[in-house]
């Protein structure tokens, strides 16, 4: 089965056609897509799962169900989920403000939203540390609220929010820009309150893009490493996330455990994204 991954798609097309000829445009594009998808996505995932499958079941379960690993699973997914919920709310508000209002500094704010895309994640982590450490600019506020951000779970949450916010804003903005304001005005003329107008007129068309943005943001938060490793203490049972745990295993040359943990994370993440995509499809069908 493994050698099939290395057979060029255009050769398979030749064999099925039974004779040599030039590829059509569709077949050429299909061959390129199969090559790209196979070698960039399918092949690495296949071999990761294949290496994991070679391990005995008792070793798989023992490694995947270690207390430290379970704690990292739970903390990573719960923190990413909380960051996604926060970004869904405030990302929607930010996108609304950028589309519907004019104010000084709007272009600067709009450009700043894309910074997490361009910045190395380690730079993002260093930026967060500079602002939120014990000697940072907001130390008086943190002292008044009696909270510690750096080297604490709150720091991990902030890092995940920082890297995943642009996904929500950028997926909602085009929908808001194409939305006709006449619908809102008509609803107001008929006596609808602002909340009723938003919930029944504006929110339904925004739902697919909001779900897409939050799904992408959730995926990005799950895989974040560079900023978290700087702003968190990375202590097991406290604020250790899966990505940092995997790196620690690799530093210890424990490749077997790292492979097993990565495979379980891959399966869990794929399952979560599968159900989220199902919800998206259901929403689109429902609104049609």
Curated annotation (Swiss-Prot):
GO terms for molecular function: ABC-type sulfate transporter activity. Residues 73-277 form the ABC transmembrane type-1 domain. One of its GO terms (cellular component) is chloroplast membrane. Coiled coil: none annotated. It comes from the Eukaryota. It is a multi-pass membrane protein. Part of the ABC transporter complex cysAWTP (TC 3.A.1.6.1) involved in sulfate/thiosulfate import. Probably responsible for the translocation of the substrate across the membrane. This is Probable sulfate transport system permease protein cysT. It comes from Marchantia polymorpha (Common liverwort). The gene is cysT.
């Amino acid at each position: 089965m493994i050698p099939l991954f290395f057979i060029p798609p255009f050769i398979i097309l030749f064999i099925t056609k039974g004779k040599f000829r030039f590829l059509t445009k569709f077949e050429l594009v299909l061959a390129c897509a199969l090559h790209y998808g196979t070698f960039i996505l399918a092949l690495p995932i296949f071999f990761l799962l294949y290496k994991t499958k070679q391990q005995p079941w008792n070793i798989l379960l023992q490694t995947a169900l270690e207390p430290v690993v379970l704690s990292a699973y739970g903390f990573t997914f719960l923190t990413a989920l909380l960051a996604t919920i926060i970004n869904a709310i405030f990302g929607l508000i930010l996108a609304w403000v950028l589309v519907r209002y004019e104010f000084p500094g709007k272009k600067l704010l709009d450009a700043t939203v894309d910074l997490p895309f361009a910045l190395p994640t380690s730079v993002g982590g260093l930026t967060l540390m500079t602002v939120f450490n014990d000697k940072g600019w907001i130390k008086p506020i943190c002292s008044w609220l009696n909270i510690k951000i750096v080297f604490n779970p709150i720091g991990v949450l902030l890092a995940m929010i920082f890297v995943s916010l642009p996904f929500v804003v950028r997926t909602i903005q085009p929908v808001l820009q194409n939305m006709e304001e006449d619908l809102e005005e008509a609803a107001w003329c008929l006596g609808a309150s602002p909340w009723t107008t938003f919930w029944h007129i504006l929110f339904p068309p925004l739902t697919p893009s909001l779900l897409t943005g939050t799904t992408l943001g959730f995926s990005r938060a799950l895989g974040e490493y560079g900023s978290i490793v700087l702003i968190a203490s990375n202590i097991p049972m406290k604020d250790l996330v899966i990505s940092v745990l995997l790196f620690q295993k690799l530093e210890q040359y424990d490749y077997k455990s790292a492979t097993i943990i990565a495979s379980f994370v891959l399966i869990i993440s794929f399952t979560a994204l599968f159900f989220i995509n199902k919800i998206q499809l259901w929403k689109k069908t429902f609104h049609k």
